[in-house]
Design a protein with these regions (language model features):
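Conserved catalytic cores of phosphodiester-cleaving nucleases, focusing on short active-site segments
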Residues: 1-13, 24-29
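Amphipathic, alpha-helical segments enriched in basic
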Residues: 2, 6, 20, 39, ...
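Short, conserved glycine- and acidic-residue-centered signature motifs
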Residues: 17-23
Length: 75
């Protein structure tokens, strides 16, 4: 299970910042592509002393792959 440690605090209303969620989603897809079972990960915000579970949903996977494709277009 990937755990991403971040400096600072997460969003005031709870949850995670969108770039952090996408980064963790990409890490989970890489793990899956290499034969690991991975359906969730954690983001821990140091200053808030809390961690949030992030599920690898179909929507997150689609978003990550779309961003990857867009980055490849720009390269």
């Amino acid at each position: 299970v990937p755990i991403e440690f971040k400096r600072g605090k997460g969003p005031r209303e709870g949850g995670v910042w969108e770039p952090d969620r996408v980064q963790l989603g990409a890490q989970m897809l890489v793990l899956r592509a290499n034969g690991y079972t991975c359906d969730h990960g954690w983001i821990a915000y140091r200053d808030a002393r809390r961690r949030e579970r992030v599920e690898l949903s179909a929507e997150l996977a689609t978003e990550v792959l779309a961003l990857r494709d867009r980055a490849l277009e720009l390269a």
